[in-house]
Amino acid sequence: MTSTLTISRLTKRFEDVAALTDVSVSVAAGERVALLGHNGAGKSTMMKIILGLIPASEGRVEVCGAAPGSREARRQVAYLPENAAFHPALTGEEQLRLYLRLRGENPRQALPLLERVGLHAAAKRRIGTYSKGMRQRVGLAQALIGHPRLLVLDEPTSGLDPVSRRDFYALLDALAADGASILLSSHALTEVEARTDRILILSEGRKVAEGSLADLRRSADLPVALNVTPRNGYASEIAASLPGAIEVGGLLHLTCSQSEKLAVFGRIAGLGTKVADLEVLPPSLEDIYSHFSRRDGQ
C-alpha cells in the first residue's frame, strides 16, 4: 500500500533540547492514525515539520512524495488547528469563497463544501454567530478545498458537544473511505479508540508504541477485568470457584492476566447455569496510553 506520509528517523532539536528523537512512522492512503502523547511529547513539533513550518534536524520526511512545505506537498496537504479562527463579520459562504480564490479554485464550490460539512443552512450567517462546533466545520470545509490526500488535524474535536463530535468523525470516516489519509492528535482517548486504524504514542519526544488497538493490548499485556453475574443463591459458590473475585452489589469482579484469560473463561463456563451473565472488559486505550507514556518518577 502506498504511503501518503513517510517519516524516517526524525529528530528535531531546539538548541540543546531534543523535541523529537529518532521517530519513524508512515501513513497509508485511506488510513486514520491517532497521534497521542502528553503535553510536550513532540506532537505539535511533528505536525509543524510535516507542514513544512519548521525544518527537521535529522531524518527524512516525505509528504505525498514531496518535501514538506514544497509547492507539491502544500497542494495535497490540509491542516485544521485546534481553534479555527475566522473573521466574525464574514458569512460562512464568504469565508469559503475567499479561501477558494486564494487556492485558485472556483468560488462556486463554497456552498457544496458547506453542505458537505452540514452547514448549508447557515451559509448566509455571519461566522461571529457560529458555535465552536460550527466554526470547526468551517475549518474542515476549508481543509477539504482541492481534495487533499493528507489531513493533519490538531485536537479537532476540542470543545465540541457529543453530537458534533460524532458527526465530525463521520465526516472523517467518509474522507478516509475516499482514500484520504488522516493524522490527528487528541487527548479524547475514548473517541479515537473506535475511530482510528492505528495509534502512535509519543513520550518525551520518542515513539514508545505504535499499532492497532489490538496490537497495543497484546504488547502492553495488561490485565483483563471480568464482571460475573451469579444467579440467585450462587454468589458464594461461584466466588469460591474464582480465586480473587470480589463481590460488589451482587456482581463478582475479578482480573486476570492475558495468559490466564482462557483458563478463567473455562472455569466460568464450567459453572454452567449458575452464571447469569459475564462481562469482559479488555484494557481501554486510556489504560494502554498510561502504560506506555509513563515517565520517570510517575
Model-derived features: positions:
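ABC transporter nucleotide-binding domains
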Residues: L5, K12-S203, A209
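Short, flexible helix/strand-to-coil boundary loops that buttress conserved ligand/catalytic motifs
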Residues: L90, R217-A220, F292
